[in-house]
Amino acid sequence: QLAGVTRATPDPPGGHIVRDEHGEPTGLLQENAMELVERVIPAPTLDDMVEALRRCNDAYVAAGITSSQDAGSDHPLQVEAYQRAVERGVLKLRTSMMIRHQLLPHLLGLGIKQGFGDDRLRIGPVKLFADGSLIGRTAAVSRPFLNDPRPDNYGITIWTQEELDELVWQAHAAGFQVATHAIGD
C-alpha cells in the first residue's frame, strides 16, 4: 500500500505482482516487481551497513569461514561500507564483490575496474540476473511449472535477449567479466 501498488498496477518488465482470484495484489512481488517497494523503503545508513557487515563477518569467522562473495552489490554506499569495514578492522573475511550492472557507471567514473582492491576486499565481475528462482517459480523454464496457480507460468525472463547482449557487451568493453544468474532451462 505504501508503494501505491493496486489492482491497476501493471506488472513491470521482468517482474510479476501476484494477485488473488479477484485481481487484488497479495503482497508477493516477484523479481523486478520488488523494485516497486524497494523505492519506498528507507535506505540504511553507512554505519548501519558497516555494523551489519561486522555481525555477519563475526558469525562467519566463528563458523570457520574465511572467504565470502557478495553476489550483487548495487549501490555506491555498499562499496563504501565494505571499504569502511576494512578500514575499521571489522572485515576479516577475504571478500569479492560482484557488482550489479547499475553500479558499473559509478565505478568506471572512479576508475575502478574488475580486480581492483587487495587481499581483503576485491571488485569482481558484473552480476546479471537473466531469470528468477526455482523456489519462487520465477526461473525461466521451457514447460510451465506443475501445480502452479497460474497454469501458464513459464517463469520470468528479466531481460530480452537483445538487452542482455547489450549489458554483457557493456561490461566486457569496460574490462569486466560477467556472472549471469540463469536458473531455468
Regions found by a protein language model. Give the residues of each.
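Divalent metal-binding segments
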Residues: 1-110, 124, 128-184
